[in-house]
Amino acid sequence: MLVLYGHSTQDLPETNARVVGGTEAGRNSWPSQISLQYRSGGSRYHTCGGTLIRQNWVMTAAHCVDYQKTFRVVAGDHNLSQNDGTEQYVSVQKIVVHPYWNSDNVAAGYDIALLRLAQSVTLNSYVQLGVLPQEGAILANNSPCYITGWGKTKTNGQLAQTLQQAYLPSVDYAICSSSSYWGSTVKNTMVCAGGDGVRSGCQGDSGGPLHCLVNGKYSVHGVTSFVSSRGCNVSRKPTVFTQVSAYISWINNVIASN
């Protein structure tokens, strides 16, 4: 599920971002990370990441659920290709996409969706809720953040089997929206991180979390949204995330009314 925008010679957003230049995460060191999988034939396939935000709600990217598929969420996973013994499998009962999301215009923003699970997961040391930032919270430039996911480990590469993490310091809006970076493609409802040309998200990381260290604890400040169509790890084209703090009231309203 690779969504391409325009030609590869232009710096246009490409959704489905995966971790490039990362390392294998410690087993269950990011216990709010989930794998969003769809059924095709008799098999299940990882398509996106997500964050467990309630025992029966997951936050992901809207572009991950643009297609009518039968989805399930796997919590507590580390190696997608084997049984770790810690996984919890739950079907997705309802999908709520942000009403302003337009799949033909990723750069407009609103790339966020909430998934209500058919039943609540059990919280333990392998499965925990992600901590969300306060509404309107803005990261300082160069804040320490990690992207996590099972996405491709290089442009046009293979999906990772074990959860990967990469250190991606945040890039503030003033820099990220400058002409030598993303320009007007990036909006102030987005978070940019990385851009060193080595480490980035890539296809398959989409929808997953950007964990940032603020006041001594990690919270999920981003939902992985897009990278450059020229490649995942392009210098001065940081990975772009939906800014979670811009959607806190929407998230709370959706959960309260569903």
UniProtKB/Swiss-Prot annotation:
PROSITE patterns: TRYPSIN_DOM (PS50240), TRYPSIN_HIS (PS00134), TRYPSIN_SER (PS00135). It comes from Homo sapiens (Human). It is an enzyme of class 3 (hydrolase). It is found in: Secreted. Pfam families: Trypsin. Keywords: Calcium, Disulfide bond, Glycoprotein, Hydrolase, Metal-binding, Protease, Secreted, Serine protease, Signal, Zymogen. Glycans are attached at residues 79, 233. Residues 9-18 form a propeptide. Disulfide bonds join 48-64, 145-212, 176-192, 202-232. Belongs to the peptidase S1 family. Elastase subfamily. SUPFAM superfamilies: Trypsin-like serine proteases. Its cofactor is Ca(2+). Binds 1 Ca(2+) ion per subunit. Transmembrane segments: none annotated. GO terms for molecular function: metal ion binding; serine-type endopeptidase activity. It catalyses: Hydrolysis of proteins, including elastin. Preferential cleavage: Ala-|-Xaa. The active site is at 63 (charge relay system), 111 (charge relay system), 206 (charge relay system). Residues 19-256 form the Peptidase S1 domain. GO terms for biological process: elastin catabolic process; exocrine pancreas development; inflammatory response; multicellular organism growth; negative regulation of transcription by RNA polymerase II; pancreas morphogenesis; positive regulation of angiogenesis; positive regulation of transcription by RNA polymerase II. Residues 1-8 form the signal peptide. This is Chymotrypsin-like elastase family member 1. Ca(2+) binds at residues 77, 79, 82, 87. Its EC number is 3.4.21.36. Basal layers of epidermis (at protein level). Not expressed in the pancreas.
